[in-house]
């Protein structure tokens, strides 16, 4: 389902489409409360209709929102409106790592800088018990001002089963159970999976 300019999802007014993929359609939108531009991802209708999938989406949104890190796309909000489930993130300008790779070789130093930034972001996620599960060039974004952002934790897995002991409680820790994947199912992009995911 595509949204027309001017469509409202709560306080967010759709401006124009900026991308689409298996995890939903992405739009440039205006936050009418805070008067800022944002990106709104509208999830596929099957997610919006499925109560369990919607709860999983909300859990993931909360998990990623706890990851305040310069190399992870910031989530501002999530919700549902008129049968559409959506998330709201910071709006980025630039290109994906896939597009940059397709444009030709880059200097080794630049490639190393990008790799280090990705590793920093993943380390922050892993410290909170979150595994991305679909890391690939299409999910890495290079902004026009030189930042590296990891996108689309939409199939992330929460691996921390129990909250930390009270003495070690981190106010941003995730007191949530692990996400469940159906037995025998494979999640991610085959060419970028770790071997143990394919077993």
What are these regions (language model features)?
Residues 1-199:
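Conserved ATP-binding/catalytic core of the eukaryotic-like protein kinase fold
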